[in-house]
From Swiss-Prot:
It is an enzyme of class 6 (ligase). The lineage of its organism: Bacteria, Bacillati, Actinomycetota, Actinomycetes, Acidothermales. It comes from Acidothermus cellulolyticus (strain ATCC 43068 / DSM 8971 / 11B). GO terms for molecular function: aminoacyl-tRNA deacylase activity; ATP binding; leucine-tRNA ligase activity. Its EC number is 6.1.1.4. The gene is leuS. This is Leucine--tRNA ligase.
Length: 832
């Protein structure tokens, strides 16, 4: 029993005469903290079905903002619903705490990154508690804690052992402002996604994860996610992985012993190749350049290195190049074609070289017309000559000027020419991917050190597991400003070490890991966040994972989500997890915008979350977030009215306080009409919450509140047991969206905390049967669905219900709806 000094011991009857959200919040927050009602059980004998609800963990850049308020309100609806249904729910919280923003912010304030980061974490933690998110706080983690990044380093070493972590010198994306490298996924429109600086190229020796080894599996396993992840995200990942089928073709370069291989999706156009292009910044171009062209080539390469990949691939920009003074030999006709270095071919894409077919590729045509190179049509599409029109003909047609495959169509031409190349030993069928290996090195301080030692005799040597973590040196007072090399390189005592293999003098690797490595496995650590002996408890992971519902922004589609899928597959191959996809279902929430635009300081349209919470209260803000519309859509805060929702909450609070029937009064003795309304609402809200139509669920809760208000004022009155039944159901359902008010209502109705564990109400089928009729839904006169609806359903409600039915959506199949005939409550006919 709670002591008198505890919040529970001090609870007294509600005596306030007005709805005071601040007083209600102050009353219940310490009670919840003491009760800790959302702690998940790891007990394998616990008979409850398990559910894992996960929000993408936040970055501690400051206090919570409006985007956090929306995303976490959405995830909390799911978690609280599962708690009410009696599941054993894991709903953890942590912080993605390493990274550039914290380091830069700390440098600007003359602080150590750790001080800045942990201060922000505590601020956000207090705000999350106030915002009443149903977290299991016992599982809290921070990726910048040595107890966490020890296991991030352990993960790196497991990839290193399997040949999936490796080091190579190559051109990388370089942010001149942050003075560090960027993965391809972190370059947006040619600029750094973090600071907006124009990205350039720089050749560095860097660490990579061999994600390309898993490219096909990443594609194939998307079948497991169909219908459970947004199609937009799956499409983005498919496009980013970029599988292409075609052929590898070997070209002999005169004066070079080894052939140069290109990949093409159209080997049938080989007869139209009139020149050969190599990426200007590739080692191959420098190798084969003729002496007489060397000066021109080197001057040209200096120009190209100033361009971003986005610039080089732009269709708007004129293509440039330089002749290398060499010729390649076309393997199908023996023709000598000139070899050029150009900016529109990238060294790290494909093989870094292409056969140029200007008649049938627009970039090749633009280049050919600029430099007066031949244009030969080899596919007759019935269109004009590209050399005259300036437009390449890229469609299908009949092959002409193509020797062995004249007169064939595309499919037959590809098959024949590929077989011929295989027969003569000059090519083979193949597949290539757009996906590049994951660049994980960063030249900054605030990250997990790479656990590798560089020994003059032994080379790259892994730090033994028993010596993990490789701790960051403190470096307090050191200049951490970006200089193009890691600040760790200046920590001489830290850098100098002993080789674990030979015992000789060696140096630590001075780069730190991309923070996406930290977040690629955090969902596993939550299962045993304080285990000092292993990254995660395998048995517990098998109990909880994969995550049942993941909530977060679409901006992570080709970053965190792809990387986590890759790491999960690696761990599966190691036998540590028994699933291949980490997140069974994904919901991408929309953005919170203002006046039609994303919030930003430059536009002056930012909305301060703290001010909104102080003005309207937590529940009104949370309710606004879920009532604004479908969770996937943006919320324009300028159009929202949290004050009106605050008034609704006050009405619910008053209803709970006016109920006079005793706790446990038999509902069957109550007004049957009101009971039917209550049970219909329970059924509909259940269906709506399970289909993530939270805004409509809130509308149904509002309708029940209106029915209760009417019943109290002009109906059976506050003593009727049906009023109590409805008010109790209202409090439980409202707890998903407005937990403080719901808890207060639960107390006013005579119950002990907490309403979150009251149990979800079950609709009585007998009451529902008494008030339902069957509505036939037709599409173009053909019956596609039968709905059970209320006899009093409005035309608008019936129209919405019919259009939302999956069978009707499938029958419409995206076609424009011409008109909808509604004869409530028994018929809807959709004409498309």
């Amino acid at each position: 029993m709670a002591g008198l000094g505890s919040p529970l011991g001090r609870l007294t009857a509600v005596t306030s005469e007005i709805y005071d959200f601040a007083a209600i919040q102050a009353r219940w927050l310490p009670v919840w903290t003491e009760l800790d009602p959302f702690r998940a059980s790891d007990d394998p004998s616990d008979p409850r079905e398990r559910r894992y609800m996960l929000d993408m963990f936040p970055y501690p850049s400051g206090d919570l903002h409006m985007g956090h308020a929306e995303a976490f309100a959405i995830g909390d609806v799911v978690a609280r619903y599962w708690f009410q249904r009696g599941y054993n729910v894991l709903h953890p919280i942590g912080w993605d705490a390493f990274g550039l923003p914290a380091e830069n912010a700390a440098i600007q304030r003359n602080l150590h990154p750790a001080d800045w980061t942990y201060r922000n974490i505590e601020t956000q933690a207090a705000s999350f508690r106030n915002y009443a998110i149903s977290f299991d706080w016992s599982r809290r983690l921070h990726t910048c804690d040595p107890e966490y990044y020890k296991w991030t380093q352990w993960l790196f070493l497991r990839l290193f052992e399997r040949g999936l972590a490796y080091r190579k010198a190559s051109p990388v994306n370089w942010c001149p402002n942050d003075q560090t490298v960027l993965a391809n996924e972190q370059v947006v429109g040619g600029t750094c996604e973090r600071c907006g600086a124009q990205v350039t190229k720089k050749t560095l020796t860097q660490w990579y994860f061999r994600i390309t080894e898993y490219a096909q599996r990443l594609l194939d396993d998307m079948a497991l996610l169909e219908g459970r992840w947004p199609e937009r995200v799956l499409t983005m990942q498919r496009n980013w992985i970029g599988r292409s089928e075609g052929a590898y073709v070997d070209f002999t370069i005169e004066g070079r012993a080894e052939p140069v291989t290109v990949f093409t999706t159209r080997p049938d156009t080989l007869y139209g190749a009139t020149f050969f292009v190599i990426a200007a910044d590739s080692p191959l171009a420098a190798e084969i350049c003729a002496p007489e062209q060397r000066a021109a080539f080197e001057a040209y390469v200096d120009q190209v290195r100033r361009l971003s990949d986005i610039d080089r691939l732009s269709t708007e920009r004129q293509k440039t190049g330089v002749f290398l003074g060499r010729y390649a030999v076309n393997p199908v006709n023996g023709e000598r074609i000139p070899v050029w270095a150009a900016d529109y071919v990238l060294a790290d894409y494909g093989t870094g070289a292409i056969m140029a077919v200007p008649a049938h590729d627009q970039r090749d045509l633009d280049f050919a017309l600029t430099y007066g190179l031949p244009v030969r049509v080899v596919v007759d599409t019935g269109e004009g000559d590209p050399a005259v029109t300036g437009v390449a003909t890229e469609g299908d047609g009949v092959h002409i000027n193509s020797g062995l495959i004249d007169g064939t169509d595309k499919a037959e031409g590809i098959a024949r020419i590929t077989r011929y190349l295989e027969d003569i030993g000059k090519g083979r069928a193949g597949v290539t991917y757009r996906l590049r290996d994951w660049l994980v090195s960063r030249q900054r301080f605030w990250g997990a050190p790479i656990p590798i030692v560089h020994c003059p005799g032994c080379g790259e040597v892994a730090v033994p597991d028993q010596d993990l973590p490789v701790l960051l040196p403190d470096l307090r007072g050191a200049d951490l400003a970006p200089k193009g090399i890691s600040p760790l390189a200046g920590a001489a005592d830290w850098v100098q070490t002993t080789c674990p293999r030979c015992g000789g003098s060696a140096q630590r690797d001075t780069d730190t890991m991309d923070t996406f490595v930290d977040s690629s496995w955090y969902y596993l650590r939550y299962c045993s966040p304080h285990d000092p002996s292993q990254p995660f408890d395998v048995a517990k992971v098998r109990q909880w994972l994969p995550v049942h519902q993941y909530v977060g922004g679409v901006e992570h589609a080709i970053l965190h989500l792809l990387y986590s899928r890759f790491i999960t597959k690696v761990l599966h191959d190691m036998g540590l997890v028994d699933f291949v996809e980490p997140f069974s279902a994904l919901l991408n929430q929309g953005q919170v915008i203002n006046q039609g635009k994303a919030m930003s300081k430059s536009l002056g349209n930012g909305v301060d979350l703290g001010e909104q919470l102080a003005t309207y209260g937590v529940d009104a803000v949370r309710l606004t977030m879920v009532f604004a519309g479908p969770p996937e859509e943006d919320i324009d805060w300028a159009d929202m009215n949290p004050g009106a929702l605050g008034k609704f909450l006050a009405r619910v609070w008053r209803i709970a306080g006016e109920v006079t029937s005793p706790v446990g009064a038999p509902p069957k003795d109550g007004d049957p009409a009101l009971r039917r309304v209550t049970h219909r609402t329970i059924r509909e809200v259940t269906e709506l919450v399970e289909s993530f139509r939270f805004n409509v669920a809130v509308a149904r809760v509002m309708e029940l509140a209106n029915a209760l208000r009417k019943a109290i004022d002009t109906g059976p009155g506050p003593a009727d047991p049906a009023v109590r039944e409805g008010a109790e159901a209202l409090a439980v359902m409202l707890s998903l969206f407005a937990p403080y008010t719901a808890e207060e209502c639960w107390a006013r109705l005579g119950h002990q905390p907490t309403v979150a564990k009251a149990g979800w109400p079950t609709p009585d089928p007998e009451l529902l049967a008494q008030e339902e009729v069957t509505c036939v839904v037709q599409v173009n006169g053909k019956v596609r669905e039968r709905l059970r609806v209320s006899p009093s359903i409005s035309e608008e409600e019936l129209r919405a219900a019919a259009l939302a039915a999956p069978a009707v959506e499938k029958a419409i199949d995206g076609r424009p709806v011409q008109r909808i005939i509604v004869r409530a409550p028994k018929l809807v006919n959709v004409v498309v």
